A protein has these predicted regions:
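Eukaryotic intrinsically disordered, low-complexity regulatory linkers and tails enriched in Ser/Thr/Pro
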Residues: 1-65
């Protein structure tokens, strides 16, 4: 399954196969804003907002057991 993800830091939109998402973790900045850092199979890290992550998290956990 393919999803479009916009990197919060660079503003670049990536088209990502969710099977390539290897790892993700939550970060909260000093202002209390939540972001998720997604690590792909090629070690590329993409920072996404909580809103973006909530749209794809069920798909990721369903396919990446």
């Amino acid at each position: 399954m393919i999803v479009n993800i916009i990197d919060l830091l660079t503003g670049v939109e990536y088209t990502v196969n969710i099977l390539h998402i290897c790892y993700f973790h939550k970060r909260v900045n000093e202002f209390g804003k939540t972001a998720y850092i997604i690590t792909l199979s090629n070690n590329k890290e993409i920072v996404v907002t909580h809103k973006q992550w909530s749209k794809i998290k069920n798909k990721v956990t369903m396919y990446n057991v």
